[in-house]
């Protein structure tokens, strides 16, 4: 049986760790509410701009590069959205695993993969394994803002517009105006974690560009119109300026909003994952303290029993010695 002093030291150590995990759990819980509110607040705008883009795509004859796959595409950019901090359970591991699966699939299809990362954990993960990262942005995983993610969004859109035959500027948040010249790419994929519920967060791989799978460019007969959410036909819409001009102007904004929405989802998922991990750690610490306390009590009881036995034995020995005299 372990020494009583060692057991008490372990109990103190576990209780100290438990205070940390409990504090982290409470902090993560408070952040989830804020992150969820931001995700929900972005939904009305997302819904409306998606409707507008569908109408524009249906009314426009514009062959925009963002709406179609490039023939003979050579390079694909993969943005891996990780966290800046740890203690989030399997949050980052699941993202890295999904990214590896996507990269393997792209390489099998003949693409050269260009990896980009957000979050310190992603930077450290790939650096430790000696895997190249073309660019990284950090410092906003828990609470992303439109301004902080500006360079990420601008770089990916500029790189796609340049294509693998052209060049764009890599913007790292420090040299936004100048930037570093890099080769463009023909596809943009994002690997992030989707917030489904407090208990479920799932790593997803999403093709950001081209956005052909997102916007249906089928022609809609004018007489049929488009049905709204209630199933009623919506009124005809006239575009001013023309649909082609509006589509070309709004596509970059649509892509930027889509990417920013993924950052918001990832932030909520990160807080939920950290809260679950810290709650599990706190519960495990509580159970461990209970077990150690039981063992310590048994050790203490055994120690007391031994001391009593020694006292009784000593008294008996003294008694026997007196009788013999």
Curated annotation (Swiss-Prot):
Its main location: membrane. It is a peripheral membrane protein. This is ATP synthase gamma chain. One of its GO terms (molecular function) is ATP binding. One of its GO terms (biological process) is proton motive force-driven plasma membrane ATP synthesis. Produces ATP from ADP in the presence of a proton gradient across the membrane. The gamma chain is believed to be important in regulating ATPase activity and the flow of protons through the CF(0) complex. SUPFAM superfamilies: ATP synthase (F1-ATPase), gamma subunit. PROSITE patterns: ATPASE_GAMMA. Belongs to the ATPase gamma chain family. It comes from the Bacteria. InterPro entries: ATP_synth_F1_ATPase_gsu, ATP_synth_F1_gsu, ATP_synth_F1_gsu_CS. It is found in: Cell membrane. Keywords: ATP synthesis, Cell membrane, CF(1), Hydrogen ion transport, Ion transport, Membrane, Transport. It comes from Corynebacterium diphtheriae (strain ATCC 700971 / NCTC 13129 / Biotype gravis). F-type ATPases have 2 components, CF(1) - the catalytic core - and CF(0) - the membrane proton channel. CF(1) has five subunits: alpha(3), beta(3), gamma(1), delta(1), epsilon(1). CF(0) has three main subunits: a, b and c. One of its GO terms (cellular component) is plasma membrane. Transmembrane segments: none annotated.
């Amino acid at each position: 049986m372990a020494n009583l002093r060692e057991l008490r030291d372990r109990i103190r150590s576990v209780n100290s760790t438990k205070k940390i995990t409990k504090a982290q759990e409470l902090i993560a819980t408070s952040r989830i509410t804020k992150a969820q509110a931001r995700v929900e607040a972005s939904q009305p705008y997302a819904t409306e701009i998606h409707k507008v883009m569908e109408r524009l795509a249906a009314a426009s004859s514009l062959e925009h590069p963002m709406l179609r796959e490039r023939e003979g595409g050579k390079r694909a950019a993969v943005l891996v959205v990780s966290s800046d901090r740890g203690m989030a359970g399997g949050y980052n591991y699941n993202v890295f695993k999904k990214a590896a699966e996507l990269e393997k699939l792209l390489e099998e299809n003949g693409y050269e993969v260009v990896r980009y990362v957000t979050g310190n954990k992603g930077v450290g993960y790939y650096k430790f394994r000696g895997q190249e990262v073309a660019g990284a942005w950090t410092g906003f995983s828990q609470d992303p803002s439109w301004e902080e993610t500006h360079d990420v969004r601008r770089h990916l859109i500029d790189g796609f517009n340049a294509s693998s035959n052209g060049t764009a500027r890599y913007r790292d948040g420090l040299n936004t105006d100048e930037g570093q010249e890099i080769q463009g790419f023909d596809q943009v994929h994002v690997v992030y974690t989707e917030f489904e519920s407090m208990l479920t967060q799932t790593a997803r791989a999403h093709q950001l560009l081209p956005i052909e799978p997102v916007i249906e460019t089928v022609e809609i007969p004018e007489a049929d119109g488009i049905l709204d959410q209630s199933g009623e036909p919506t009124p005809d819409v006239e575009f001013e300026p023309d649909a082609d001009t509006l589509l070309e102007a709004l596509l970059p904004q649509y892509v930027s909003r889509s990417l920013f929405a993924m950052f918001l989802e990832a932030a909520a998922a990160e807080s939920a994952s950290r809260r679950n991990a810290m709650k599990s750690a706190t519960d495990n610490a509580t159970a461990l303290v209970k077990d150690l306390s039981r063992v310590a009590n048994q050790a203490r009881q055994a120690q007391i029993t031994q001391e009593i036995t020694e006292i009784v034995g000593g008294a008996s020995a003294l008694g026997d010695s007196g009788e013999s005299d």
